[in-house]
């Protein structure tokens, strides 16, 4: 994933 949270 590009981010540690849902982008």
From Swiss-Prot:
GO terms for molecular function: ion channel regulator activity; toxin activity. The modification Cysteine amide is found at residue 7. Disulfide bonds join 3-7. It is found in: Secreted. Keywords: Amidation, Disulfide bond, Hydroxylation, Ion channel impairing toxin, Secreted, Toxin. The keyword Disulfide bond applies. The keyword Transmembrane does not apply. GO terms for cellular component: extracellular region. Expressed by the venom duct. Its main location: secreted. The cysteine framework is C-C. Its target is unknown, but this toxin may modulate voltage-activated calcium channels (Cav) or calcium-dependent potassium channels (KCa). This is Contryphan Zo747/Zo763. The lineage of its organism: Eukaryota, Metazoa, Spiralia, Lophotrochozoa, Mollusca.
